[in-house]
């Protein structure tokens, strides 16, 4: 039995979960609505405010999908109640981020500013720099965990951190392996 898959999911107050045909799960909550089609073999049961996920057999595929299915449903419930966020840090001289309406405008050392339109259900929060050398914080916020992660990865890919000075966009919790520069020539 999957340790994660066998745990029941408690549906909080104010959240409505609908399990349709072919395991089409819809979760409605205070922050919005999420719909996801899950694997049709998995058995999803809702009894009152508790959801359980069971697998039809002990095949390798069903064992691997058991915990995944439970986690996907739980992530949808957390998304519509609390939301998801991913924090990024922008390091580098002249690297800036600001919001123009909902559009994120990044100055990352290119000859032009990079404009990013947010996908539906995604928004950005730009922090303030405390001093000129401090990194700038940027947070991607949304209700779909997968979409928040993809958007954060897309922003990071515009200027990934480089190993010599650490300039670029990195995740807040990411550690960069720094390299020593080349040794100077003796005179």
UniProtKB/Swiss-Prot annotation:
User: Transcription regulation: is it a keyword of this entry?
Assistant: no
Domain of life per record: Bacteria
Extract the Gene3D superfamilies matched here.
Ribosomal protein L6, alpha-beta domain
Establish whether keyword RNA-binding is in the entry.
Answer: yes
Q: Which GO terms describe its biological process?
A: cytoplasmic translation
Give GO cellular component annotations, separated by semicolons.
Answer: cytosolic large ribosomal subunit
Q: What InterPro entries does the annotation carry? A: Ribosomal_uL6-like, Ribosomal_uL6-like_a/b-dom_sf, Ribosomal_uL6_a/b-dom, Ribosomal_uL6_bac-type, Ribosomal_uL6_CS
Q: Which UniProt keywords apply?
A: Ribonucleoprotein, Ribosomal protein, RNA-binding, rRNA-binding
The record's GO molecular-function terms, alphabetically, read: rRNA binding; structural constituent of ribosome
Residues spanning the signal sequence: none
A Pfam family recorded for this sequence: Ribosomal_L6
Q: Which HAMAP family match?
A: Ribosomal_uL6_B (MF_01365_B)
Role description: This protein binds to the 23S rRNA, and is important in its secondary structure. It is located near the subunit interface in the base of the L7/L12 stalk, and near the tRNA binding site of the peptidyltransferase center.
Give the record's subunit note. Answer: Part of the 50S ribosomal subunit.
| Family assignment from sequence similarity | Belongs to the universal ribosomal protein uL6 family.
Name of the protein this chain belongs to:
Large ribosomal subunit protein uL6
Specify the species.
Answer: Chloroflexus aggregans (strain MD-66 / DSM 9485)
């Amino acid at each position: 039995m999957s340790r994660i898959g066998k745990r029941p999911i408690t549906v909080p107050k104010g959240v409505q979960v609908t399990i349709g045909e072919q395991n089409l799960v819809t979760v409605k909550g205070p922050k919005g609505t999420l719909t996801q089609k899950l694997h049709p073999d998995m058995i999803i049961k809702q009894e009152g405010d508790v959801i359980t996920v069971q697998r039809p057999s002990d095949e390798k595929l069903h064992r691997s999908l058991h915990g995944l299915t439970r986690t996907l449903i739980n992530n949808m419930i957390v998304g519509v109640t609390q939301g998801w966020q991913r924090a990024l840090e922008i390091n580098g001289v002249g690297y800036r981020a600001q919001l123009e309406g909902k559009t994120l405008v990044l100055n990352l050392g290119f000859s032009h500013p990079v404009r990013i339109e947010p996908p539906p259900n995604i928004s950005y929060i730009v922090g303030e720099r405390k001093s000129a050398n401090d990194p700038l914080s940027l947070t991607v916020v949304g209700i779909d965990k997968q979409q928040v992660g993809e958007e954060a990865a897309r922003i990071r890919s515009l200027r990934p951190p480089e190993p010599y000075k650490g300039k670029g966009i990195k995740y807040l919790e990411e550690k960069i392996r720094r390299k020593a520069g080349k040794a100077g020539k003796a005179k």
